[in-house]
């Protein structure tokens, strides 16, 4: 199932993005909780849920909360923000939130023991809302930049509300290896961000805006999908783009383009 991550339409408000996605035949979305809050402050969280329901949209995931796994001075603030985000996620019928690792410190092995504890603490906050914390490894993180490390942290946390997710951009442009997919247990992957890595610029200077639509780059997305299906992943493929030109594209047009790019790869 093709899913639209609201970051792909960053220049638009919640209603405009959701209406454009629905018009394009999208049924799965990954709302930005900041955008949902802006909408709710003018109307209500219940109105946001009604909008999704009326459009035939399901919030498959929500975005996001940084600063949860790695030790750091900002963690207390991250945990406070997590509370309102989980409450809002629950209000729009969403049962999961992305927790990217964006650590920039110099970490030790003991920090990874604390990382598992940190994920458990975050999950205890999320559990009363029926929300799961999904650890996302990111290519620039100094703490969790690869699938093996993310799996280690999630497994050591050993909490029913802590799961692992993957972004194909971070996977292929980062330090993970294709063979790392074999480490996944059946049904272990909880969510998927689905984009391509361009041949240029060199990976050493790649940035988030360099992401391209699936099929336009060098990532072996077809092979990745084959492995994930074998690993019993049956969730959505969510397009998360940071290119300012794409973020300014009419949400309907962005969603039409997403479907054309992704659907042939995930059939």
Region annotations inferred by a language model:
Residues 8-10, 33-35, 65-68, 101-105, ...:
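Active-site-proximal loop/turn and secondary-structure-junction residues that shape catalytic pockets
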Residues 1-25, 56, 93, 144-166, ...:
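Histidine-acidic metal/acid-base catalytic patches
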Residues 1-13, 21, 32-34, 38-45, ...:
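N-terminal-biased segments
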Residues 39, 65, 102, 205-210:
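Vicinal oxygen chelate
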Residues 30, 61-63, 98, 134, ...:
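Conserved beta-strand positions in the central sheet of alpha/beta enzyme cores
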Residues 30-52, 101-107:
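Glycine-rich, proline-tolerant flexible connector loops at the mouths of alpha/beta enzymes
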Residues 15-16, 51-55, 70-164, 173:
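Active-site acidic/histidine proton-transfer and metal-coordination neighborhood
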Residues 40-43, 71-76, 108-113, 175-178, ...:
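Short, solvent-exposed loop/turn segments at secondary-structure boundaries
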């Amino acid at each position: 199932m093709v899913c639209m991550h609201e970051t792909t339409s960053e220049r638009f408000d919640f209603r405009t993005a959701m209406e454009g996605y629905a018009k394009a035949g999208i049924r799965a979305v990954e709302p930005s909780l900041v955008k949902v809050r802006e909408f709710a402050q003018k109307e209500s969280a219940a109105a946001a849920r009604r909008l999704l329901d009326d459009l035939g949209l399901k919030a498959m995931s929500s975005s996001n909360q940084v600063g949860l796994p790695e030790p750091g001075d900002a963690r207390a603030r991250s945990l406070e923000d997590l509370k309102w985000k989980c409450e809002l996620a629950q209000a729009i019928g969403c049962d999961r939130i992305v927790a990217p690792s964006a650590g920039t410190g110099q970490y030790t092995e003991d920090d990874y023991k604390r990382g598992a504890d940190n994920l458990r603490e975050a999950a205890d906050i999320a559990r009363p809302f029926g929300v799961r914390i999904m650890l996302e490894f990111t290519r620039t993180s100094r703490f969790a930049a690869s699938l093996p490390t993310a799996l280690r942290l999630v497994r050591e946390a050993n909490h029913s509300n802590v799961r692992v997710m993957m972004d194909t951009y971070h996977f292929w442009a980062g330090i993970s290896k294709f063979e790392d997919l074999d480490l996944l247990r059946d049904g272990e992957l909880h969510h998927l961000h689905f984009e391509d890595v361009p041949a240029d610029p060199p990976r050493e200077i790649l940035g988030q805006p360099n992401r391209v639509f699936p099929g336009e780059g060098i990532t072996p997305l077809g092979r990745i999908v084959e492995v994930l299906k074998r690993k019993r992943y049956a969730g959505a493929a969510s397009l998360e783009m940071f290119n300012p030109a794409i973020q300014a594209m009419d949400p309907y047009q962005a969603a039409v383009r997403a479907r054309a790019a992704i659907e042939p790869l995930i059939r």
